Amino acid sequence: DVKAAIRYLRKDFANGDTYGIDPNTVFVGGSSAGAVTAIHLAYIDNVSDLPTTPFDIQAVANNLGGLEGDAGNMGYSSEVNGVISFAGGINTLSWIDANDEPLVSCQGDADQTVSYNCAPGLGQATVLELCGTGEMHPQADLVGVLNDKLVFPGADHSWCSSGNSSNFIQALDFTTDFLFPLLPCNNTTAITEVNSTQRKLLKITDVLGRVT
């Protein structure tokens, strides 16, 4: 469904651009299960990479249309340019490999829902293993993927449940600082002198849409 949503935005860009996006700069992210979804969307390359035990996830994926799914908007790319993880994790660390998308993560190191290191999700043996920030970023460093992490010492999984919490606000600012250099508009060599004199500054926002 997330891939279908990304395809929808690119389809909309090609048919009027209701949302004013840059189709070549799409970041995907979320918190908790949303972060887990975003991470796996970006880093799983083939259905054959998926586990078959204790659950046959390959069969599930194939029944739902493969990695691209069957939720529509086909013919448009679902590729992303970066991943944002608030308290998320990945099932298999080796899925993060060379030339993958940049990763920024924020997590408490006492998280028992999605382990900061590696453990079954929700702390239950019947749930697939998830490896959190403490393991994903050494893997990203190992294979040369651009990454950064913000760790909240002693914090559990609940810090990202409130958008007004000090940790959540800090995480937003940290994420903004990580993503900002990745935006194409920071490549000033792509702006000609003529174009720059014709542009008028209307307002300044950060990458999350907040007016600065």
Locate the predicted segments by residue.
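Primarily recognizes the serine-hydrolase "nucleophile elbow" in alpha/beta-hydrolase
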Residues: 4-99
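Hydrophobic anchor at the start of a short beta-strand
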Residues: 26, 103, 147-148
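Short beta-strand/loop motif that positions the catalytic acidic residue
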Residues: 105-107, 111
